[in-house]
Design a protein with these regions (language model features):
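Amphipathic alpha-helical segments within well-ordered protein domains
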Residues: 171, 182-185
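Core structural elements
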Residues: 158-176
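Acidic interhelical loop/turn segments
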Residues: 152-158
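Positively charged
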Residues: 1-152, 179, 183, 190-193, ...
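Small/polar glycine-rich anion-binding or flexible loop at a beta-alpha turn
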Residues: 160-163, 185-190
């Protein structure tokens, strides 16, 4: 996608403790009526939607959770309707965005005016100066954390991916808190994201990977 093709507004899908990064693909099971409407509208237009975490510490006047400022726009690359009227889609992350304002409308789902100017680098294919050897300690600590929480990860398959896919996949799949995942999403670069993962893992290791908060 080119800069000139980026939309000025987008439908947003608030999902707690879930993030998507550029250049990663995730499956989604859509069943709520308002989000079925959202997918229908998206499929009729540009197939784009924004994934964003609700900010559960802040609420609007109607008691609806506010949204975090930063999310990631994705494009629907696969769509299937099930016999019980659910939608099974795959969403490919394209570029992060910042919310400027929420748009008031009669639609059941939420829409926002958005800005991409701080994240144009997400559209580029530049390679960052990171080696797999830089991830060895992170892999070791993550394996301990995942095992402790009962998570099953195909590590061999993960190691065959590119570095950005590996780091972003680990960030998405990790049993981190909402706030911790938001920090990873907002990290300016892949190198910074890798460092943030290491910092979070350090706080967990102090409590034998049972910690649930990070300062």
């Amino acid at each position: 996608m080119k800069k000139v093709d980026l939309p000025k507004k987008i439908a947003v899908f608030p999902l707690s403790n879930f993030i998507i990064f550029p250049k990663t693909t995730v499956p989604l099971n859509i069943f709520e009526p308002r989000y079925l409407d959202m997918i229908n509208d998206s499929m009729k237009s540009n197939k784009l939607l924004g994934m964003i975490q609700p900010n559960l510490s802040k609420h609007q006047s109607n008691n609806t959770p506010q949204l975090h400022e930063i999310g990631c726009m994705g494009k629907i690359t696969s769509f299937k309707e099930t016999d019980d009227s659910r939608y099974l889609i795959e969403l490919k992350g394209l570029i992060r965005f910042k919310i400027i304002s929420e748009i008031q409308s009669n639609k059941k789902y939420r829409e926002c005016e958005i800005d991409f100017k701080n994240f144009y680098g997400d559209l580029e294919n530049k390679k960052e100066d990171i080696k797999f050897s830089d991830l060895e300690l992170i892999f070791k600590d993550l394996k301990s954390l995942f095992e402790k929480r009962g998570f099953i990860i195909n590590w061999k398959a993960l190691e065959k991916q590119s570095l950005d896919e590996t780091i972003n996949a680990l960030a998405m799949a990790s049993p981190f808190t909402i706030e911790e995942k938001q920090v990873l999403l907002e990290a300016e670069s892949l190198n910074i994201r890798k460092t943030k993962i290491a910092e979070i893992l350090t706080t967990y290791s102090f409590d034998q990977y049972n910690n649930t908060t990070v300062q």
